[in-house]
């Protein structure tokens, strides 16, 4: 009878019952398996803290009738597999075909090697493939000079005479070779351009490493568009005729005396180019670069930021002589646009610099409101950043499906010309005293600078940046360094404006800084004494003064966008939380093909494996993930 009941059960049910029994038995024999798996589970990082692995890969081109909406994922029903002739497989997720033959043993070794394990455990992703990097390098070779761009002659002269004045060799950087012709609509290479959006607007992403010249890459096409627009604008042409007639009628009187009584310019409070940046320091920096071009090409650029008085901000925007370009922070411009919506009615070019920061939580509301108000008249939308997190990549795919992605070969990579050193603070002589280790590292740099082979009457002044993770730590570290005879200042949002601008001016200047050597050579003597005790023991503070160094202790406020050409040394007091912070902080050194050095202070609670893999990736020239 049991045999008859057993034969009445089909083979599939019998197999399922056997599998269930074996699984439950295995679970009872190995009760640790579930606990072990759960313990190794890690909390996922937010997408805004994770680098994107498909920066250079645009979304698939949709048909003419599909519009800009993202296709909705429909769940498969019970009969979804019936009457199909084509497999429902996403070609982007399809596995890549394996190579037929391995070229060498090195390929096999690289294939089996699991690199950057600690970085990948932090949910960071790989960058663009090396095949795409090679193709980008080939396209870059077609441009060797600014004369090859379709720019107006006056703009070309402004680049050579003002923007790059003093440089012995004037050549475009990699991002400028790729971005300027794309923004001008100049066909370069074999890569087809993405189609325009439904209203004829063009969207671009400029993703390039820190210190690569992105500011000039988006300013030059914008200035070229301003000058072309002046020639074609009938309102501006008629205003200039009336202004010339008024000058002749007044008989050579200064324009500044009567211009406010004359009719306002058509561009008064109606800029055609808007550049958004996250901080007031970046407003000043971008404005200074734009004014160099404006001095030669004759257009009007004005800054708007919280560091400027409200009365001056009002004059900059509502000046009777008009304004062509505005450089502002998002919150201030969004507030002005809310009270005066017509401010953004004539904007044709909108640039969002440091897009990964401006489209993050703190700035996204103001930034998106500005973009929405400028959309009706917008011709070009340009996003710029040195790091593209996954959150920003998803945002661009949903909001701007036709965006043209312009990436450089070294995206998400720290240049090899920047060397990284690691100091283990947990060992002797520091014994977990990071402040002591930081002061000792700065004294060592000052001691090396005092031994240079230049004139004996002068010594070089080294400008050093120290980065911390917490704003409260900046003042503590700065006070400790000052007590050890080091000229240091804390840079954060509460720092006085005049002191902040004074220190930043010395760090962004391209000119070398030198001081006269003391007669008794007390710098070397003090450095030698400081080196004996790790720069910690001294009873006379005047004897241990280090005059040939200037130090800024800052948070990420100074790690984004500021063009610190004079900085050669960067000290990471705290280990950065993500590779994005590594890229921006170490990117303050080694800018514009200059050498630099980074020093990381690693304590007992820091991730040593992450620091080791970042150092190895920098040595190998690999992109961080």
Curated annotation (Swiss-Prot):
Residues 195-406 form the Helicase ATP-binding domain. Keywords: ATP-binding, Helicase, Hydrolase, Mitochondrion, Nucleotide-binding, RNA-binding, Transit peptide. It comes from the Eukaryota. It is found in: Mitochondrion. Residues 1-16 form a transit peptide. This is ATP-dependent RNA helicase mrh4, mitochondrial. ATP binds at residues 208-215. A motif (Q motif) lies at residues 144-177. A motif (DEAD box) lies at residues 353-356. One of its GO terms (molecular function) is RNA binding. Residues 19-28 have a biased composition (Low complexity). Disulfide bonds: none annotated. SUPFAM superfamilies: P-loop containing nucleoside triphosphate hydrolases (SSF52540). One of its GO terms (cellular component) is mitochondrion. The Q motif is unique to and characteristic of the DEAD box family of RNA helicases and controls ATP binding and hydrolysis. Its EC number is 3.6.4.13. Residues 19-119 are annotated as: Disordered. Residues 453-625 form the Helicase C-terminal domain. Residues 90-113 have a biased composition (Basic and acidic residues). It catalyses: ATP + H2O = ADP + phosphate + H(+). Belongs to the DEAD box helicase family. MRH4 subfamily. ATP-binding RNA helicase involved in mitochondrial RNA metabolism. Required for maintenance of mitochondrial DNA. InterPro entries: DEAD/DEAH_box_helicase_dom, Helicase_ATP-bd, Helicase_C-like, P-loop_NTPase. Transmembrane segments: none annotated. GO terms for biological process: maturation of LSU-rRNA from tricistronic rRNA transcript (SSU-rRNA, 5.8S rRNA, LSU-rRNA).
């Amino acid at each position: 009878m049991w045999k008859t009941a057993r034969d009445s059960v089909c083979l599939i049910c019998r197999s399922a019952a056997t599998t269930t029994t074996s699984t439950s038995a295995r679970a009872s024999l190995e009760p640790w398996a579930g606990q072990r798996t759960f313990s190794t589970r890690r909390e996922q990082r937010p997408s805004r803290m994770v680098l994107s692995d498909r920066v250079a890969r645009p979304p698939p081109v949709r048909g003419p009738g599909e519009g800009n909406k993202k296709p909705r994922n429909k769940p498969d029903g019970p009969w979804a597999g019936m009457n199909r002739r084509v497999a429902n497989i996403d070609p982007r997720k399809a596995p890549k075909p394996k190579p037929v033959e391995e070229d060498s043993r090195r390929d096999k070794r690289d294939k089996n090697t699991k690199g950057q394990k600690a970085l990948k455990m932090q949910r960071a992703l790989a960058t663009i493939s090396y095949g795409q990097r090679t193709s980008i390098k080939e396209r870059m070779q077609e441009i060797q000079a600014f004369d090859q761009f379709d720019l107006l002659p006056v703009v070309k002269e402004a680049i050579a005479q003002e923007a790059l004045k003093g440089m012995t060799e004037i050549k475009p950087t990699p991002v400028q070779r790729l971005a300027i012709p794309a923004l001008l609509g100049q066909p370069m290479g074999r890569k087809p351009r993405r189609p325009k959006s439904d209203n004829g607007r063009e969207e671009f992403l400029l993703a390039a490493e820190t210190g690569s010249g992105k500011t000039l890459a988006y300013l030059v096409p914008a200035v070229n568009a301003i000058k072309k627009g002046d020639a074609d604008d009938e309102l501006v042409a008629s205003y200039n005729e009336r202004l010339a007639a008024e000058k002749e009628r007044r008989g050579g009187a200064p324009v500044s005396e009567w211009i406010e009584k004359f009719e306002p310019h058509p561009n008064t409070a109606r800029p055609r180019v808007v550049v958004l940046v996250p901080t007031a320091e970046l407003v000043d920096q971008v404005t200074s670069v734009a004014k160099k071009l404006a001095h030669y090409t004759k257009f009007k650029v004005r800054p708007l930021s919280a560091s400027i008085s409200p009365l001056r901000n009002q004059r900059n925007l509502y000046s009777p002589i008009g304004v062509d370009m505005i450089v502002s922070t998002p919150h201030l411009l969004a507030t002005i646009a809310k009270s005066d919506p017509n401010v953004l009615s004539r904007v044709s070019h909108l640039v969002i610099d440091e897009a990964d920061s401006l489209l993050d939580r703190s700035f996204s509301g103001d930034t998106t409101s500005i973009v929405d108000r400028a959309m009706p008249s917008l011709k070009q939308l340009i996003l710029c950043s040195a790091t593209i997190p996954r959150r920003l990549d998803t945002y661009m795919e949903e909001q701007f499906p036709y965006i043209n992605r312009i990436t450089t070969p070294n995206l998400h990579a720290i240049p090899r010309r920047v060397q990284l050193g690691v100091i283990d603070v947990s060992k002797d002589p520091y014994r977990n005293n990071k402040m002591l280790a930081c002061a000792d590292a700065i004294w060592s740099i000052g001691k090396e600078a005092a031994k240079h082979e230049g004139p004996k009457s002068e010594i070089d002044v080294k400008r050093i940046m120290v980065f911390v993770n917490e704003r409260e730590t900046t003042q503590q570290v700065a006070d400790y360094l000052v007590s050890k005879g080091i000229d240091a200042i804390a840079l954060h949002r509460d720092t006085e404006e005049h002191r902040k601008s004074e220190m930043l001016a010395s760090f962004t200047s391209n000119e070398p800084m030198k001081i006269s050597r003391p007669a008794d050579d007390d710098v070397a003597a003090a450095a030698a004494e400081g080196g004996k005790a790790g720069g910690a023991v001294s009873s006379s503070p005047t004897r241990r003064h280090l005059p040939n160094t200037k130090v800024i202790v800052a948070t990420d406020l100074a790690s984004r966008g500021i063009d610190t050409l004079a900085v050669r040394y960067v000290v990471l007091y705290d280990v950065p939380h993500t590779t994005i912070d590594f890229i921006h902080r170490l990117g303050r050194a080694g800018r514009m093909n200059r050498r630099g050095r980074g020093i990381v202070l690693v304590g007992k609670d820091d991730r040593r494996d992450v620091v080791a893999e970042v150092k190895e990736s920098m040595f190998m020239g690999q992109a961080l993930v």
